[in-house]
Amino acid sequence: MPNKSKPNRLIAEKSPYLLQHAHNPVDWFPWGEEAFAKAKRENKPVLVSIGYSTTCHWWPGIIKSCGTPLKDNRSHFKR
């Protein structure tokens, strides 16, 4: 789902699946210590997308509309 926004950190990845999400408005992380360290530091859960794009035909709609819902629902994940 390309757009004209600045690419996120996935732009540096080699995986075609990750690269197709490099211009999403979501601040995605590739699998790795950086994501888990941030989650631990902020006391937040980690949402894992397994990268099986053929099962995610609904993902673009969620990504497109997620800005406000994600911001509004962050409080549900705080302890």
Curated annotation (Swiss-Prot):
Superkingdom field: Bacteria
SUPFAM superfamilies (alphabetical): Thioredoxin-like
Protein name, per record: Uncharacterized protein YyaO
Lineage: Bacteria, Bacillati, Bacillota, Bacilli, Bacillales
Pfam families linked: Thioredox_DsbH (PF03190)
Family matches, as InterPro entries: Ssp411, Ssp411-like_TRX, Thioredoxin-like_sf
